[in-house]
């Protein structure tokens, strides 16, 4: 099937070793394969950005999952019997998932705090009603593509101190921090969990990549030092009626850039950064830098 084309969300960064043999098999079969999670972060690619469309839903669902496990109400309630204070939320990572988590928690009535290694996102956090937990540093931890990069040991120490201080006052937290090609950064330790209020909940969206929370397990809900820790890195799958149409539209928009209406076939222009950035194998060879080391 030399003319066959495969597309999908293969998670090449996270599972390169696991998937390498599979991609080699695809190449030997003459398949042309694309990994859409490698889509360049440029304006022309926004309608094809699977990571963004799915992460947006995941950020929303993470807050819903956390709130459902809380033993208390989220918004402030003033009644004749007394006043219920609003819940405090902490969102770690202000990418697409994190920003949606901030917006969702705010709409539910929580007092929302957020932290990110990229100080540039402070304005976005505040525009959604969140309060930015800033860690002062002269270092730049943002890649050219807008993703977070690995931080220095000094910064990690400062960040951990700031997060620990805020966590001690937090009723529920959502962690979304991922670094392409590397294990998820450890943001919350078991000691930090033990300092959280009774009944606190943490959702670790990076659990399949090693986890932002010490002790979290992907696909499991466990209690660590009195805190309910939900490990779930595939929350969008729990919203199939919303996730599937967006996923399908992303793929359709991507295929549309390659489709030649006159010839009624797909033409691969490897000068196009969308094609070059996402194609794993072509013409019997593995060509993406993730595999070739180029």
What are these regions (language model features)?
Residues 37-80, 207, 213-294:
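Adenosine-phosphate binding glycine-rich loop
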Residues 2-13:
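Single conserved hydrophobic/aromatic residue that forms the stacking wall/gate
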Residues 1, 142-173, 177-194, 232, ...:
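A structured beta-alpha segment of the ubiquitous adenosine-cofactor-binding alpha/beta core
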Residues 8, 169, 197-198:
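Alpha-helix C-terminal capping/helix-to-coil transition sites in glycosyltransferase folds
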Residues 75-166:
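Glycine-rich phosphate/diphosphate-binding loop of Rossmann-like nucleotide-binding domains
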Residues 17-43, 184-234:
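Rossmann-fold NAD(P)-binding glycine/threonine-rich loop
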Residues 23, 63, 101-102, 122, ...:
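Generic hydrophobic/aromatic pocket-lining and core-packing "Φ" positions
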């Amino acid at each position: 099937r030399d003319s066959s084309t495969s597309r999908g969300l293969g998670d090449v960064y996270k599972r390169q070793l696991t998937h390498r043999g599979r991609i080699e098999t695809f190449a030997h079969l003459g398949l042309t394969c694309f990994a859409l999670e490698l889509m360049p972060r440029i304006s022309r690619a926004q309608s094809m950005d699977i990571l963004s469309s799915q992460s947006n839903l995941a950020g929303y669902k993470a807050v819903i999952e956390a709130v459902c496990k809380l033993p208390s109400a989220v918004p402030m309630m003033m009644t004749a019997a007394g006043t219920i204070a609003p819940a405090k939320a902490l969102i770690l990572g202000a990418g697409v998932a994190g920003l949606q988590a901030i917006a969702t928690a705010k709409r539910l009535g929580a007092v929302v705090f957020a932290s990110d290694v990229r100080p540039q996102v402070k304005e976005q956090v505040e525009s959604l009603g969140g309060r930015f937990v800033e860690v002062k540093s002269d270092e730049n931890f943002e890649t050219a593509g807008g993703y977070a990069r690995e931080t220095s040991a000094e910064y990690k120490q400062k960040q951990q101190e700031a997060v620990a201080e805020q966590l001690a006052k937090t009723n529920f937290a959502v962690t979304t921090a991922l670094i392409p090609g590397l294990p998820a950064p450890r943001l919350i330790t078991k000691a930090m969990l033990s300092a959280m209020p009774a009944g606190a909940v943490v959702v670790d969206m990076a659990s399949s990549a090693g986890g932002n929370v010490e002790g979290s397990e992907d696909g499991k809900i466990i209690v660590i030092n009195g805190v309910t820790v939900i490990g779930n890195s595939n929350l969008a799958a729990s919203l199939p009626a919303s996730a599937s149409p967006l996923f399908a539209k992303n793929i359709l928009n991507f295929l549309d850039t390659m489709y030649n209406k006159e010839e009624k076939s797909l033409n691969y222009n490897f000068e196009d950064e969308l094609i070059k950035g996402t194609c794993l194998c072509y013409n019997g060879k593995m060509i993406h830098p993730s595999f070739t080391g180029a």
